[in-house]
């Protein structure tokens, strides 16, 4: 497959035909941006799909073209690492609705040079997965050795197991949930309202002016980023320490290190992400409820599955706490699925799966080694 131009870095495909969305709309001319690492073997049996979290992208193990930083999961993917491109063909695509090359609100409507903006249809996690399935068809991959995802990526992995059970041999769900809770929805709504309250949002029509609502998007990111951390981690890293000063300013600059850190996170984020995409993708996660899709009983989503599952949580994650993972495990047990579960200890909260987490790496490696077929 070395000379097959379908595989490699910075790849694009226009999906053939139409994609019917859960909301009732039809999308045509869908662009999907993706990357692959490693080579597909002769019988196409070594493919692993990586599903990215909320605001990540297809650059899982290559330098980001905007920030120049290493891939968001380069700790997990690479030579000698748990997901090794010398053994596997690894695929990661930018989700439908995003802004790093796949069709989303910043894309032109077919046959025009006018962005969709808020005319883009509301999408779901299942819509994202349907688009990924079409990508795999194009790549000639009938069945995945594994689908792996953390956070929103875990939602996609669950949806893969439910919607395309015959196409997935193994499923790894990390720091995720089978449905968004009221608290999760609440935090997302704060972020969306911050964006829409920014005068530069202009009802989503800010592309022509090239003056996006960066202030609102930065605040949305700051609010969300808090949920990715843990109280113990914040205390250990920042405490109440002041930022570059000996005394409080008695003003509203960033007196505390944590304030400066959050502002920095917001500024960095707006350099690489689109505000409207943030609205659409957070809405997709809020709509996610796998049990609701199957008559209100989560076990029904996995009935008859032959896939192996590995569910992993972190003890400091309060965005998707271990209790959410246990719900998934109980449903898989009720469905008679083969499932292993690990709660890992890590002080870094929800973001633990993106950071140095040796226990996570050992767990994923061991699970993949358990299926050598």
Swiss-Prot record:
NCBIfam families: homoserO_Ac_trn, PRK00175.1
Keywords from the named record: Acyltransferase, Amino-acid biosynthesis, Cytoplasm, Methionine biosynthesis, Transferase
Catalytic activity, reaction form: L-homoserine + acetyl-CoA = O-acetyl-L-homoserine + CoA
InterPro entries associated with the record: AB_hydrolase_1 (IPR000073), AB_hydrolase_fold (IPR029058), HAT_MetX-like (IPR008220)
GO molecular function terms listed in the Swiss-Prot or TrEMBL record: homoserine O-acetyltransferase activity
Top-level taxon of the source organism: Bacteria
Enzyme Commission identifier(s): 2.3.1.31
Protein name: Homoserine O-acetyltransferase
Transmembrane annotation, as ranges: none
Binding site for substrate: 221, 351
Function according to Swiss-Prot or TrEMBL: Transfers an acetyl group from acetyl-CoA to L-homoserine, forming acetyl-L-homoserine.
Subunit architecture: Homodimer.
Gene name of the encoded protein: metXA
Subcellular location: Cytoplasm
UniProt GO cellular component terms: cytoplasm
Pathway assigned to this chain's UniProt record: Amino-acid biosynthesis; L-methionine biosynthesis via de novo pathway; O-acetyl-L-homoserine from L-homoserine: step 1/1
GO BP, one annotated term: methionine biosynthetic process
Keyword Acyltransferase: yes
Domain spans labelled AB hydrolase-1: 46-355
Pfam families cross-referenced by the UniProt entry: Abhydrolase_1 (PF00561)
UniProt similarity note: Belongs to the AB hydrolase superfamily. MetX family.
Source organism (scientific name): Zymomonas mobilis subsp. mobilis (strain ATCC 31821 / ZM4 / CP4)
């Amino acid at each position: 497959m070395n000379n097959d131009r379908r595989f490699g870095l910075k790849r694009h495909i226009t999906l053939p035909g139409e994609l019917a969305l859960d909301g009732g709309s039809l999308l045509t001319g869908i662009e999907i941006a993706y990357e692959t690492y490693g080579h597909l073997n002769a019988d196409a049996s070594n493919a692993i799909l990586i599903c990215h979290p909320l605001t990540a992208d297809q650059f899982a193990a290559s330098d980001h073209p905007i920030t120049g930083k290493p891939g968001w999961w380069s700790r997990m993917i690479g030579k000698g690492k748990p997901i090794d491109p010398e053994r596997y063909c690894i695929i990661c695509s930018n989700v439908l609705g995003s802004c790093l090359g796949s069709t989303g609100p910043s894309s032109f409507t077919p046959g025009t040079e006018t962005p969709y903006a808020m005319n883009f249809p509301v999408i779901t996690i299942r819509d994202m997965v349907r688009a990924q399935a079409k990508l795999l068809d194009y790549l000639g991959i009938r069945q995945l050795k594994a689908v792996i995802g953390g956070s929103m990526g875990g939602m996609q992995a669950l949806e893969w197991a439910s919607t395309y059970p015959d196409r997935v041999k193994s499923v790894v769900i990390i720091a995720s949930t089978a449905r968004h809770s009221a608290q999760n929805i609440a935090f997302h709504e704060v972020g969306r309202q911050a964006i829409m309250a920014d005068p530069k949002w202009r009802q989503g029509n800010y592309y022509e002016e090239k003056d996006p609502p960066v202030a609102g998007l930065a605040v949305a990111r700051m609010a969300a980023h808090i949920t990715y951390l843990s109280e113990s981690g914040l205390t250990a890293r920042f405490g109440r320490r002041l930022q570059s000063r000996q005394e409080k300013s008695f003003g509203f600059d960033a007196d505390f290190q944590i304030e400066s850190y959050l502002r920095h996170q917001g500024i960095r984020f707006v350099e690489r992400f689109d505000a409207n995409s943030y609205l659409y993708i957070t809405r997709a996660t809020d709509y996610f409820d796998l049990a609701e899709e199957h008559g209100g009983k989560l076990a029904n989503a996995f009935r008859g599955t032959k896939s192996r599952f590995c569910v992993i949580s972190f003890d400091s994650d309060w965005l998707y706490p271990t209790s959410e993972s246990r719900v998934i495990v109980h449903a898989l047990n009720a469905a008679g699925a083969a499932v292993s579960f690990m709660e890992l200890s890590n002080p870094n909260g929800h973001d633990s799966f993106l950071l140095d987490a040796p226990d996570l790496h050992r767990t994923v490696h061991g699970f993949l080694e358990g299926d050598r077929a």
